[in-house]
């Protein structure tokens, strides 16, 4: 496949939309590849990783417990809640809700967790506190996936998202235990199959979270590397494309394939 930037340009023309991408070394934070890395893109469900980072920060501070049971009702459920809809009778723990939000992209689980951190404004305040002055959450699931052209609500930039992920996974902002827990939830992602996982060679590490919108957007945040090691952060967002979801998936997989093929560069 072509070099990553060539593949990205190709994807933009095939999608008639915009691609935003960054590839960052996890250890050093050095940027290896960037395309529209400072432009805004809808986060969609990729925000759920940051959300569970905020939850884990509360756990580390002693303000929350992963074992705490949350009870909820039918009227708390929103569209696409494959795990939480099964637990109306018994409720779910905070840890189970994070697992559902990240591994299955369960929207009601995300809303229940969002309430514990003070809603969209509370999550945005957490981002500011860890030094991300760009990423913003304004709405709840499922409205946050609206992805209107030119709308800054519920957006990030590839550069800001990558830096924030790096802070959550490697800095002292979360305990070592919480860092490992956040990464493990991403390793266990069950709904990212058609994206980078579809082009992953044997023996490569991946941990990821995807996002989708009915209105022309798609995204993935991932940790990736050969020798089963999380070597780099890769963030890819698409927006304003008329292409089908299958086509969006294919283009993201193509960009992933180009990155993997030209890893040593």
From Swiss-Prot:
Protein's name in the database: Beta-lactamase SHV-4
Organism: Klebsiella pneumoniae
EC number per UniProt: 3.5.2.6
Classification of source organism: Bacteria, Pseudomonadati, Pseudomonadota, Gammaproteobacteria, Enterobacterales
Catalytic center residues: 45 (acyl-ester intermediate), 143 (proton acceptor)
Signal sequence, start to end: none
S-S pairs: 52-98
GO molecular function: beta-lactamase activity
Enzyme class: hydrolase
Keywords, alphabetical: Antibiotic resistance, Disulfide bond, Hydrolase, Plasmid
